[in-house]
Amino acid sequence: MQPREIAKFIDHTALTTEKTEQDILKLCDEAVAHHFRSVCINSGYIPLAKQKLTGTGVKICTVVGFPLGANLSSVKAFEAQEAIKAGAQEVDMVINVGLIKSGKWDEVRSDIEQVLHACRGTLLKVILETCLLTKAEIVHACEICRDLNVGFVKTSTGFNKSGATVADVALMRQTVGENIGVKASGGIRDTQTTLAMINAGATRIGASAGIAIIQGLQDNNGGY
């Protein structure tokens, strides 16, 4: 796989608390230069990114209920609606892990449904935080997302004890089938890991190390 091909898998990400306006502008410049799929940013920076990215082909992705997922569903839905109004083209919401652990699957479904309705056709990715779930819980959460026809299921916020694993990505892909995307995120920092995730079924990669990932491919392929 060539660097330009793998770049289209990458959501170039900057979600940590200390990110400044200059950090976001740099992120946008890098995304344009390297042809990344999107930038993934907190919603407060959407207007800034929109000014920078309009007409470039790089999309703006934002997060909702991040990173805990424990907000009221109505708050998540409003957050998604406002983010889209500001210019977000993709939304990554965090599932309510506490409800999963409580066995309240109808409420888990309702939480996702409310955000999905608020998105009104804007691509929705549902973050499962797989490091906190059993395999059975991952499967059940994926089945709900598949039945609701969300855009993607996503492994991780990157803010918990661990991120994506090849085994979890493969399980998610097996469960949702071929019509829903799988996004691997959290701890993906090099080319080898990225390719392993793609081979396991990931169709999107969330990473703050996108440049290092494609530079590894350049090194291996002898050029861009």
Curated annotation (Swiss-Prot):
Domain of life (superkingdom): Bacteria
Molecular function GO labels: deoxyribose-phosphate aldolase activity
Major location (coarse): cytoplasm
GO CC, alphabetical: cytoplasm
Swiss-Prot/TrEMBL keywords: Cytoplasm, Lyase, Schiff base
EC number: 4.1.2.4
GO biological process, one term: deoxyribonucleotide catabolic process
The protein's name in its UniProt record: Deoxyribose-phosphate aldolase
Biological classification of the source: Bacteria, Pseudomonadati, Pseudomonadota, Gammaproteobacteria, Pasteurellales
Gene name of the record: deoC
